[in-house]
A protein has these predicted regions:
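Nucleotide-activated donor-binding/catalytic signature segment of Leloir-type glycosyltransferases, i.e.
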Residues: 281-282, 286-323
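Short hydrophobic beta-strand element within catalytic cores of glycosyltransferases
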Residues: 354-357, 367, 371-376
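A short, well-ordered alpha-helix in the C-terminal region of glycosyltransferases
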Residues: 402, 409, 416-430, 447
Length: 463
């Protein structure tokens, strides 16, 4: 079988024999040294080495040998897949769904889509991918979160899901999944998630397999917009933070970013400049009231940013303009309290920008001390509900002093910051590029096809 399928298989089940094989390798090494140093032991060591080599191979490969005896020589074609979600939405959920479609198409997987109309203010028809109309499919990949599953099910109808292998692609930011959403599992045969952090949260309560499937990170090419178009001087060093005001302001924590910048640089008129980009600021008052937040949260945020002589960008941009904004900055900052994945950070790294971020939650799948600047934190308990996030759960409180020190470090050593940015771009391209993501999705769908064709007994139980 192809190496890619094996990698996908063992990436899911995590075979324990690899740990035993490491021990065998160590013993083999000892035997080899004895062989080289003591001729009297030559024959005995040859026998020991041969036995250990066989033991190592048997420890690593029992599943592979069993599969090789049982599985067909050629892999089946990936089954036809329908991606259902807010495909035309100009937000993170829409971006994730479109990325899945692009990755599947690039991996030569038959794919179609069903666009669930988002709210009118979020709809951007020009974002719809060009694909054939929906035909009969074997797999439904529902790109909506647990909270919206029931509404989607009612909209599509029970017959749409009957007889299919139904997969949910969920994004979730907290370490615990609310009990009120457990019923959503009943529709699905498995759940895909974008990070190991979310995988741990959902797998703890899921009655079906939970597979970590990396999302595609491929932002639009930067448009023609320049710093001048954004009202940003050319001679300033720009720290940028972007967020959606409807994504729970307390979680995104823009005030934390402003506080860290103020501690690092005060209110400079030259040199460092903080730019904050926000979506849906006009809808915040009603949203805040629904969460029991004060109506003046955005007003306070605006005042805090003005106090450090920062720039607030509160209009909606198309994808190429957002990419141009990221490309125009010098460093990206996110002092979030938790993230299911952290798309804006990944996109900034895609463009080679040094990134400062809370060292907690989903972004740790792609951020390391070698490619970014991770901020220390302490876990704090939520004393009240914040939207879907329940009192008693935990999220991170980033260390503002440490964040300020890292901002100063980036500004003081531009060569080191640039080097980390280059490493970041390479890491994102290698692990979240279209080839890596498409190959992983294709491998998973091929495994599902093998199970459907009656080879389930030859596959590990945890698949």
């Amino acid at each position: 079988l192809a190496g890619g399928l094996w990698d996908g298989l063992f990436g899911v089940v995590g075979p324990e024999p690899h740990r035993f094989s490491a021990a065998a390798s160590a013993l083999f090494s000892v035997a080899a040294r004895l062989y080289a140093g003591r001729k009297a032991w030559r024959t005995a060591c040859e026998r020991v080495a041969a036995k250990l080599a066989r033991a190592r191979k048997d420890a690593v490969d029992p599943t592979r040998r069993r599969l090789a005896r049982s599985l067909p020589e050629e892999l089946p074609m990936p089954p036809s897949t329908a991606v259902i979600g807010y495909i035309s939405a100009a937000n993170g959920m829409g971006e994730a769904a479109r990325g899945t479609i692009v990755a599947l198409s690039a991996a030569q997987c038959p794919v179609h889509f069903v666009d669930i109309d988002p709210e009118p203010t979020l709809k951007a028809v020009d974002l719809l991918p060009a694909l054939p109309e929906l035909r009969k499919t074997a797999i439904n990949l529902l790109h909506v979160n647990a909270v919206n599953v029931t509404r989607c099910y009612e909209q599509m109808g029970a017959s749409f899901f009957r007889g299919k292998h139904n997969i949910g692609f969920w994004f979730w930011e907290m370490p615990t999944l609310p009990r009120r959403w457990y019923g959503a599992f009943s529709l699905f045969d498995e759940i895909w998630v974008a990070s190991r952090y979310t995988q741990a949260a959902i797998a703890a309560v899921a009655p079906v397999p939970v597979v970590c499937m990396r999302p595609l990170v491929q932002p639009a090419a930067a448009g023609s917009a320049t710093r001048k178009d954004f009202g940003i001087p050319d001679d300033r060093f720009v720290f940028l933070f972007c967020f959606d005001a409807l994504s729970i302001l307390e979680r995104k924590n823009p005030q934390g970013t402003i506080a860290a910048f103020r501690r690092a640089f005060g209110a400079p008129l030259k040199g460092p400049l903080l730019v904050v980009k926000v979506n849906n600021s006009d809808r915040v008052p009603g949203h805040e009231r629904s969460l029991g937040m004060p109506d003046d949260y955005m007003a306070d945020l605006t005042a805090s940013l003005a106090a450090v002589n920062g720039v607030l960008l509160d209009q909606r941009y198309d994808r190429s303009t957002v990419s141009a904004l990221i490309a125009a900055c010098d460093c990206y900052v996110s002092l979030h309290r938790c993230e299911g994945f952290g798309l804006t950070m990944a996109e900034a790294m895609y463009f080679g920008k040094p990134c400062i971020a809370t060292g907690y939650s989903g972004n740790l799948d792609f951020m390391t001390p070698a490619n970014s600047y991770l901020v220390g934190y302490r876990l704090t308990e939520l004393e009240r509900d914040w939207g879907p996030y329940e009192a008693g759960d935990h999220w991170a409180e980033p260390d503002i002093d440490h964040a300020a020190e890292l901002m100063q470090a980036v500004y003081a050593d531009l060569s080191l910051a640039a080097a980390r940015g280059l490493t970041a771009a390479s890491d994102i391209a290698q692990n979240y590029g279209i080839q890596a993501v498409g190959s992983a999705m294709r491998s998973r769908l091929q495994l599902l096809a093998l199970k459907k064709e009656g080879f389930g007994a030859a596959l590990p139980n945890r698949l």
